[in-house]
Amino acid sequence: MTKRYWNIILEEMMEAGVHFGHGTRKWNPKMSPYISANRKGIHITNLIRTARFLSESCDLVFHAASGGKQFLIVGTKKKAADSVARAAIRARCHYVNKKWLGGMLTNWYTTKTRLQKFRDLRMQQKTGRFDCFPKKDAAILKRHLAQLETYLGGIKYMKGLPDIVIIIDQQEEYTALRECITLEIPTICLIDTNSDPDLADISIPANDDAIASIRFILNKLVFAICEGRSRSIRNS
């Protein structure tokens, strides 16, 4: 796989607070190689390592996107949710940013059935079919549709399992990560100093609590995906 230059600048990472980890009491000893210092009880991530693994991740998603692969971005905590949705929409990726429903990938048949129900209800609403039902029944259908939109809206166009899953915050999205491991779906995971770097295929050590840090990482990955898609279009 050819390496490319992704303009990952250390000063910009510092401005985004990418280097700030968790308190020294909340850490995983496996993260020791990725920590450069202890500042006032806070672990500081080695940004050289961060840049290296972020660059590797960008190379991976670029080549995958140029080959027409499908991506799923997962980040459900409040600080990540909006950034995940914007990044995914920009790169035409699927996303989950509200709640990970257990078995979303490992029980794909059930998820596919829910998605079909979601699409059917959306079509009924668009064509005015809800107006044909009694008010009480229509209200129930609208609530059900709203619930499906909340939890499945980001994957409504997903026809099968994703080729690569990008996860924001390993601790928060552990269930999603385990499902990917079970199904052998490649993962890129943003990990803080309290995480296990051995679980994902590529782990990017970075601050997973600051919005600016999350956006910085996502922006680089999304740019690489968009570049890969553009290359695919040019070569077709």
UniProtKB/Swiss-Prot annotation:
Keywords: Chloroplast, Plastid, Ribonucleoprotein, Ribosomal protein. Pfam families: Ribosomal_S2. It comes from the Eukaryota. It is found in: Plastid, Chloroplast. InterPro entries: Ribosomal_uS2 (IPR001865), Ribosomal_uS2_bac/mit/plastid (IPR005706), Ribosomal_uS2_CS (IPR018130), Ribosomal_uS2_flav_dom_sf (IPR023591). One of its GO terms (molecular function) is structural constituent of ribosome. NCBIfam families: rpsB_bact. Belongs to the universal ribosomal protein uS2 family. This is Small ribosomal subunit protein uS2c. The lineage of its organism: Eukaryota, Viridiplantae, Streptophyta, Embryophyta, Tracheophyta.
